[in-house]
Amino acid sequence: MQINSQSRDVFYVSDGTAITCETLGHVVLGQFSLIPNEKTFPFVESEDKVADVIKEIEISYQRDGVKPLVFFSIVVPEIREMLLKAPAHGYDVLESIVQKVQDDIQMEPQPKMQRSRSVSKDSDTYFDRIAAIEYTLAHDDGITLKGLDEANIILLGVSRSGKTPTSLYMAMQFGLRVVNYPFIAEDVKMMRLLPEFEIHRHKLFGLTINPERLNEIRENRLSGSEYASTEQCKLELDTVEALFRREAIPYINTSSLSVEEITTRILERAGMKRRLFG
């Protein structure tokens, strides 16, 4: 039976960093008209930790009356079996792929904890990514415009157009230092490009979204508010897109794109080399 629900709780559970679970989960969920309420549980390596995750799943099921979606990667059989008994739809993100490779190459897999590369083995890469994540978090949502010289990409757009998840994905997966700046309702009255951005035009990239989709997302956050109204969404988007065109800032519509697709298009347009971190 099809359940017409615009939102669903989604859990990413792993005995490692959970980055693989999140990445594959985002790709899959991007195929559906769904607003995921996401929670991530990395380093679930003991029965106590998985018990805590199961409690969260049970709370979600009891509250919403529908089973949440769980994307997981767990090696220890006992922990895996505990998780599979939870009231959720569970998806092992590696199982079908590993089985197919095993059949094709006729070799038994040797499961191991899904750790990232060790710091000692690849310390420069590790610390580059940590620095990129810290920089991106410090420059999220217009918190500060200091240190723009260090930025690789500067994302511009209205609130809830996908800037934060895209910024963090770029930092975590590609080690890019990303600034994201939101245009708010007050900016619409006198829309202009901030002086701080003038000398960094080559780093600017705009994100826009369909007004209907923006209204849906904002209603889920602040239902009935002027901020979420269709009229306000359309006004903000029209004004910001006019700025992008006037200032020759490249931009894309994120309405039907996953963060992975958004990132790929930005990197291609910016001519930047992909440096995927494991």
UniProtKB/Swiss-Prot annotation:
What's the protein here called? Putative phosphoenolpyruvate synthase regulatory protein
Enzyme Commission number(s) of this protein = 2.7.11.33, 2.7.4.28
Q: Does the keyword Transmembrane helix apply?
A: no
Report the PANTHER family cross-referenced here: PYRUVATE, PHOSPHATE DIKINASE REGULATORY PROTEIN 1, CHLOROPLASTIC
Pfam families listed in its UniProt record: Kinase-PPPase (PF03618)
The regions listed as transmembrane in this protein's record are: none
Purpose of the protein: Bifunctional serine/threonine kinase and phosphorylase involved in the regulation of the phosphoenolpyruvate synthase (PEPS) by catalyzing its phosphorylation/dephosphorylation.
What is catalyzed by this enzyme?
A: [pyruvate, water dikinase] + ADP = [pyruvate, water dikinase]-phosphate + AMP + H(+); [pyruvate, water dikinase]-phosphate + phosphate + H(+) = [pyruvate, water dikinase] + diphosphate
Give the top-level enzyme category.
Answer: transferase
Traced from the root, the source organism's taxonomic lineage reads:
Bacteria, Pseudomonadati, Pseudomonadota, Gammaproteobacteria, Vibrionales
The alphabetical list of record keywords is: Kinase, Nucleotide-binding, Serine/threonine-protein kinase, Transferase
